[in-house]
Swiss-Prot record:
It comes from Nitrosococcus oceani (strain ATCC 19707 / BCRC 17464 / JCM 30415 / NCIMB 11848 / C-107). This is Small ribosomal subunit protein uS10. One of its GO terms (molecular function) is tRNA binding. GO terms for biological process: translation. Keywords: Ribonucleoprotein, Ribosomal protein.
Amino acid sequence: MAKQQIIRIRLKAFDHRLIDQSAREIVDTAKRTGAHVRGPIPLPTRKERFTILISPHVNKDARDQYEIRTHKRLMDIVDPTEKTVDALMKLDLAAGVDVQIKLT
């Protein structure tokens, strides 16, 4: 039995609306070209919290807290055709989305 070829796509972004829109575009493009898509699977959101002192000298109680959330999605495209790969390469995604593509 031949092993299936899988394209694994990981998306990262700070804005969840942007990452969901990009995931929809990838899924629509892959389905239009006849590939089977698993996902998008939401992965755990990474939350980085920073606490900064407001006062330059005294008043240690005066602080601001900031948070950066990194949203992630995972998609598998099973048995992609040549047409699917070409369409995904030509796809223009939003600037705030980091895309990692892995062939297995």
